[in-house]
Amino acid sequence: VYRQKLTIEDEKEFFQGLVQEISMVKNGRIPLEHYYSANCPDDTFRAIYQAYVKRCKTSKLLDFDDILLYTYELLTNRNDILRGWQKRFSYILVDEFQDINQLQYDVVKLLAKPEDNLFIVGDDDQSIYAFRGAKPEIMLHFPEDYPDAKTELLACNYRSASTIVELSQKVISENSRRYKKELFADRMGGNPVTIQAFEDGKQEELYVKNQVKELLKKGIPYEEMAVLYRTNSGARFLVETLMQYQIPFCMRDTLPNLYEHWIAQDVISYIRIAMGERSRREFLRIMNRPNRYFSRDALDDAQVSFEGLRWFYEEKDWMCDRIDKLEEDLNTLKRMTPYGAINYIRYGIGYEEYLKEYAGYRKIKAEELFEVMEELALSAKGFKSFSDWFVHIEEYTQQLKEQAKKQASEKKGITISTLHSIKGLEFDAVFLMDVNEGSLPYHKAVTESSIEEERRLFYVGITRARKFLWILYAKNRHDKELEVSRFLTESGLVLKEEKDKKK
C-alpha cells in the first residue's frame, strides 16, 4: 500500500474495504483484470492484490479464503483424495445455509457426491452478508441442483409476539427473490408496534431515553433492551445521551468517537494553529487541505513560522499570497465560536472542496464526509469558547475509554448494535433507529438485489424483538429534510401521503 504512495486518511475503513475486496476476488474466482475496486483506482487495487498474494506465498501463509480455494483445487485435481473424503462422510448437514458463498457451496457439492445426502437448513430472509460473498440465490436454486430434494418450510415464529411477526411479514413479502411463505406466530397477541416520526435526531434519541425508563418501570432490565442502527456511526449521539443520563449500555461494535475521526482531527488542528500552536505536526495536517501547494521542505524546524514560510517562497509571489491568505483565515478563526469556526473552515477556507476531491479519489460519496463535518458542528453548537469545547472532547473521550473497560469485564446494560452484528440474538424490547431513505436502505444500495438485502436486514432487526418494538425515523437531520424509508411506505406501515408531505 505504501509503495503505491496513496494518501489515505480513513485508513481503518480503507483496509477493511481492501480485505473484503481481496476476499471477494478469491471466493468468486474473479479474474483480476475483470474486477473493479470500490476503494481505490483499479490499477492500484490490482497492484496491492498481487503484492498481497506474493507476500503470502513467500511467507508460506494462507488466509481463510486460501484454505477454501486450495481445498477446492485439491479436490478437483486429485480424484483419489476426493474419493477418500467422500467415503468418510455418508451424510452432510449445513446450517445457516443462507450465508454460504459459491466457493463453499462447490466444496460441499464435491464432498456430497455420489450419494448427494445433503441436509441444508437456513432462512433465505436472513441472508445479509453479500459483502462477504454470500449469495441467497444459492439456497433458492438448490432444488434445481438437486431435483429430488424435499423442501420443508418452517413458517412458525416461536420468538416474537404476533403483532411483530405480522409486521415482519408485511415487510419481507415485498422481496421477490425468496421462498414464498406466510409467517405466523406461536405467541398470539402482544403489544402494538410503535412507528414514530421525530422532527430531528436529537428528539429521537431523547425519546429512546424516556422509553428506556418506562420499560424499567415495567420490570424489563437493561439487558433485555436493544437499540439497532444500520451503521455503527449512527450511534454516536445516542452514546453521548446515554452517558449524560448515566444509563448503562454495551456496544457490540467499536465505540464510536467522533473526535478521533480524521476530519475532526483536521478541524481541531486548524483551531489549535489559530490559537497559537505552531508545531510542525499540526501544520502538516492542514497545510494542503485545501491544496495550497506548500512543500514539506518549507517546514525544516519543529516549529513553523509564517515569516519562515515567506522567506522560503520569497521568489514566488503567488505562494506568498497563499501564505497571507492562510494567516488571515487563522486570525479570523480565533475570534469565532467553535460552531462558527467549523463552518468557516468548511466553507470560508475551502475544506469542503478538499473533501470533494478526496471522496472522488477514494470512490466514496462526498456526502458521507460532509456528514462528519455536520455532526462535528452540531457537537460544538452549545460551546462559547474553544477551551470549553476541548474540555468536553477530553471528558467524552475519557468516558468512552471507561465504557470500553466496563464492557470488557461486565457486558451489562442496553445493547447498542448494528443490524449486521445483532443477528442470532433476541430481546424483550427493540428500538430500530433512523429508518430513513439513505440509512435503511443504505445510500450505497442502488441495485434491485442490494435493495432486497437491505430489506432483509430490516427484517432481521424487526425479528430480534420478543414483546416490544419501536421503529423510529427523523424528518430532519443537520438542517436537511429526510425521507421516511420506502420499507415503511411500500408495506403500508406509513401512509404514502405522509411520505409525500416531507418532500
Positions of the model-derived regions?
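Conserved helicase C-terminal RecA-like lobe
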Residues: 38, 221, 236-241, 268-498
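Short glycine-/polar-rich loops that comprise or flank the Walker A/P-loop
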Residues: 114-117, 123-125, 146-151, 189-193, ...
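Helicase P-loop NTPase motor core
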Residues: 147-150, 155-248, 274-276, 333-335
